[in-house]
Structure formats: structure tokens, C-alpha cells
From Swiss-Prot:
Subunit (UniProt): Homodimer. Interacts with MalT and MelA.
One annotated GO molecular function: carboxylic ester hydrolase activity
EC number from the UniProt entry: 3.1.1.-
Positions of the catalytic residues: 165, 262, 292
First-tier enzyme category under EC: hydrolase
Keyword list, A-Z: Cytoplasm, Hydrolase, Serine esterase
Known function: Displays esterase activity towards short chain fatty esters (acyl chain length of up to 8 carbons). Able to hydrolyze triacetylglycerol (triacetin) and tributyrylglycerol (tributyrin), but not trioleylglycerol (triolein) or cholesterol oleate. Negatively regulates MalT activity by antagonizing maltotriose binding. Inhibits MelA galactosidase activity.
UniProt cross-references to HAMAP family, sorted A to Z: Acetyl_esterase
Any GO CC annotation of this UniProt entry: cytoplasm
Protein name: Acetyl esterase
InterPro entries to which the protein is assigned, alphabetical: AB_hydrolase_3, AB_hydrolase_fold, Acetyl_esterase, GDXG_lipolytic_enzyme, Lipase_GDXG_put_SER_AS
Pfam families: Abhydrolase_3 (PF07859)
Length: 323
């Protein structure tokens, strides 16, 4: 599709989103578009420091977990001494960027709003680690904490998964992996999904949206996919193209959030409509005037904080509902 035919989303954003797009951090260099991936990772970490500031204070603990691929670092956020459930968080970043620090504020706010222990998983990034390593590392982390719950004062009878963007795919894929492989790490009471991609190769929204402002052009999306997958056959795997999995049964309750001008919004719409058609518990909410990744910007956007609180409320409601 010719770029000129795309919707001019920058003229349609909310005032809050526009303020974020126009915000310039003092002393921050331009994005290293032609830099190597490690340079881009360091830039992303530097750029996110401002957005992670002024986060709620709470007890945190770092735990290095052994997995079949080697050690994986996790961070436990405990807003109170005891917790009614444990929520595992998978960060976004196109499978190639991000870590526990780039999403620290998001996890702290989720812990505060749910009152539960949130465990961030610093899964191995692509292209150094290819599908399905991040999923298998996540499952190994869940298994570890289910076996060491007392040591960390965790309640693992009720667990959940959460993630944004690529992390949302990993969150849902990990829950389906547990179901499909008959691995028990606790009762998965909910999955919180913010603007994820779930396997579509093309869609109306991917044609109409996406540009330099969000790093989600068609070329960008192809690059992320090629970095993550081992080969083209993986595109059809039921834990990458989640629409090739069985979504008609035993899918944990899903909170599905999308951004209005996100090229990935059709993934969320299709996921919601599929689950709804098969009577799988789910809730869908679109946040008007927003771009992909808006969850990061709660320091300037009340709607980002609203989206986190909406997910937290969904999770807390499922804590009280027997499954």
C-alpha cells in the first residue's frame, strides 16, 4: 500500500498522545536506525528511563532461575507481605528489545493495582534466541516458582500472565503451551493482553496504520518476525500464529486491550471475536486516540494508567471467581 494512502494518524491522536509524540527528552540522541541491535537495545533502555521514573515503591527481589537454556533473571514485585495470586509479566519490544528495567514502572503499577506479586521474566531476546525459547523459558520459570512458592512467599494456586506487544503474544502462547503440554504451575485465572500480535500476516489495520512514529511499518514487522522465528514454517506454529491453536476450549479469561491507531489492532479484534464466538471468557477494550506502546507513558497519559487499572480490575475479579 502506498504510504500516501495510509490514514494520517498523527492528526487524529488524543491531546495526551500528541504531547508524548512531541515530547523531547533533554540530551537524548536520535534513534540509531542504522546501529547494530545491541546499540538499539542500549538506546531503548536509555530512552525508557524517563518513563519509568516516579514509580511506586515496594519490596523487590531478584531471582535467577535455571532453565533448559541457561539461567533467566526474574524480578519479584511484592506490594504486600502476602499475595492472593501471582502474575507473570512478559515485556514487549518486538522480541529483540527490552528487559526488566524498560518495563519496571508498568510492573510496579500492576503490582500496586492488583495487590499481587508480579514476577517479571527477563526472557532471552532474538535473534540470539529463536522461537520457542522465550516460551519455554517462561514455562520453566513458572514451574520453578510453583515448586519454590514457600521460599518466596508466593500464592501459586492462582496465577496469571500479562504482557504488552510481543510480550502479550508470549503471555498467551505460554498459557496455551501449559494447557497443550499438560504442565501444571497453578490455576491460570486470567491473561492480560495489551496491544499484542497473535499471528496475522496481513490485515486492514496493518495496511492503514504504522509508520516512523511507532516503528511498525510492514518492513519493521517483517524484521521482528524474521529475528524471532527459526524458519518460515514457524509462522504457522500454533504457539506463534495463535489462531492456529485451539481457541474453542479451556482458554483462561482474557483481557484484550488495543490502541485505536495501532497496525496490530486487528489481531486483538480477531482474538476477541474468536474467543467470544466460542464462549471463552474475555473482555475487549479499545483506547481511543492512542498509538501502540502507549502503556509506557503513564507519567503523561491518564489513559495509560486507566488501561493498567482496567487490566488489574479484570484480574482481581477472576481471583474471586472459582474456575
Amino acid at each position: 500500500m502506498k504510504p500516501e494512502n495510509k490514514i494520517p494518524v498523527l492528526t487524529r491522536l488524543s491531546d495526551e498522545m500528541t504531547a508524548v509524540v512531541n515530547f523531547q527528552q533533554p540530551g537524548l540522541p536520535p534513534w540509531p536506525a542504522d546501529g547494530d541491535i545491541e546499540t538499539q537495545r542500549q538506546y531503548y533502555l536509555l530512552e525508557r528511563r524517563f518513563w519509568n521514573a516516579d514509580a511506586p515503591s515496594m519490596t523487590t527481589r531478584t531471582c535467577v532461575v535455571p532453565t533448559p537454556y541457561g539461567d533467566v533473571t526474574t524480578r519479584l514485585y511484592s506490594p504486600q507481605p502476602t499475595s492472593q495470586a501471582t502474575l507473570y509479566y512478559l515485556h514487549g519490544g518486538g522480541f529483540i528489545l527490552g528487559n526488566l528495567d524498560t518495563h519496571d514502572r508498568i510492573m510496579r503499577l500492576l503490582a500496586r493495582y492488583t495487590g499481587c506479586t508480579v514476577i517479571g521474566i527477563d526472557y532471552s531476546l532474538s535473534p540470539q534466541a529463536r522461537y520457542p525459547q522465550a516460551i519455554e523459558e517462561t514455562v520453566a520459570v513458572c514451574s520453578y516458582f510453583s515448586q519454590h512458592a514457600d521460599e518466596y512467599s508466593l500464592n501459586v494456586e492462582k496465577i496469571g500472565f500479562a504482557g504488552d506487544s510481543a510480550g502479550a503474544m508470549l503471555a498467551l502462547a505460554s498459557a496455551l503451551w501449559l494447557r497443550d503440554k499438560h504442565i501444571r504451575c497453578g490455576n491460570v485465572i486470567a491473561i492480560l493482553l495489551w496491544y499484542g500480535l497473535y499471528g496475522l500476516q496481513d490485515s486492514v489495520s496493518r495496511r492503514l496504520f504504522g509508520g516512523a512514529w511507532d516503528g511498525l511499518t510492514r518492513e519493521d514487522l517483517d524484521m521482528y518476525e524474521k529475528a524471532y522465528l527459526r524458519n518460515e514454517d514457524d509462522r504457522e506454529s500454533p504457539w506463534y500464529c495463535l489462531f492456529n491453536n485451539d481457541l474453542t476450549r479451556d482458554v483462561p479469561p482474557c483481557f484484550i486491550a488495543s490502541a485505536e491507531f495501532d497496525p496490530l489492532i486487528d489481531d486483538s479484534r480477531l482474538l476477541h471475536q474468536t474467543l467470544q464466538a466460542h464462549q471463552q471468557p474475555c473482555e475487549y477494550k479499545m483506547y481511543p486516540g492512542t498509538l501502540h506502546a502507549f502503556l509506557h507513558y503513564s507519567r503523561m497519559m491518564t489513559i495509560a494508567d486507566d488501561a493498567l487499572q482496567d487490566g488489574a480490575r479484570f484480574f482481581m475479579a477472576r481471583m474471586k471467581t472459582p474456575r
